[in-house]
Amino acid sequence: MASDDFSAASSTTPPSPTRGGSFALPHLTDLTVDLHAPPSGTWATELLLECAAAVSGGATARANELMWLLNELSSPYGDTHQRLTAYFLRALLALSSSSATSSLRALAAAGDRNRSFESTRRTALRFQDVSPWCTFGHVASNGAILEALEGEPFLHILDLSNTFCTQWPTFLEALATRSGDAPRLRLTAVFGGAALHQVAKEIGARLKKFARLMGIPFDFRAVHHDGDPAELDFESLGGGGTAASGGAGLAVNCVNTLHGVPSGERRNAMAAALRRLRPKIVTVVEEVADLRPEECGDFARSFAESLRFFTAYFDSLEESFPKTSNERLALEKAAERAIMDLVAGDPARSTERRETAASWSARMSAAGFSPLPLSDDVGDDLSALLKRYREGWSMAAPPPAGTFLLWKEQPVVWASAWKPSPPPPPH
């Protein structure tokens, strides 16, 4: 692959399309302990937690003292703790001054101004080169989709992810290695935000060029949708066995998609809408944190869980990127917007509230899906993937479905596959 092509955005070995048994991993049986353990006892953690308690408790004088101290100690260009403190401090300031809406709007506008196809591509490439944070879910999803749609002459993938199609070059490569005639692939990708129109156009052109190189008949459709993914017109995007799908085997790919839906019944409605599409498979990849408003009713608990999750994320970036990396800064600025939303935004409208593997599994099961175990072949591909990166990464199997990516023994990403459950027997 040419180094200047977007098709190089996913350089992992494509998963084997052959079927195999499900693979076995160590099980994490007590997620509550792992997820809710306090972050390491650094000065940043202690001061931020105390400041959050002062803000939520109305102790204005103490909150102001702590904010002044945190401002002196923090820096968006310092070490992990200084960077993290800077972003959480800004969110606490926005909360205390009731300026969350304007702060989120300003951060979003700044992100749009700095986003281009080249900057998006460069950040994605570099992040995948140095960390499995994204590629882990890509490899798991690709392998599961390839196996679920094996033998189908016409494949339709509805990609609801926010990863700018970076997982599909290796999927195209894997299709090209299959024996017999290459199947026709239709990729429908959903993009959010007006600033992404040009990015989507560039991505589509490069994917079409790469598909021609691989000898894969390929159709690409970009759908632009701002706001809640649950409000998409799913039937028009790809309705399983209906005319909208043209009889294709349908796969729905959700990488960091579901937590973009406001928590509660909206997420249940989203899962139910996916079930009505009658797909062969739905892949769900989500970052792991228990930030549901119904479970994080008090601000202190929600703040501590947000701090725990982003401490792990920033720590992984610290050990993967140079301190002055532009790509690292871009990833951290995106995290800053998420932190602002979680700390200062309205929980009922938040698009950043992650869940646990158990809670996502419960939603999928309630919507009429059954877990689809990842095969030995996919497990082998994931194991090989982690060997490419520095020490500290591992994986384990959570109950009841999927597999975890762990950073320093802490679950950070969950990858899973689901199939429609058979209808209940008639009474």
Each model region followed by its residue ranges:
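Long, compositionally biased intrinsically disordered terminal regions
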Residues: 1-427
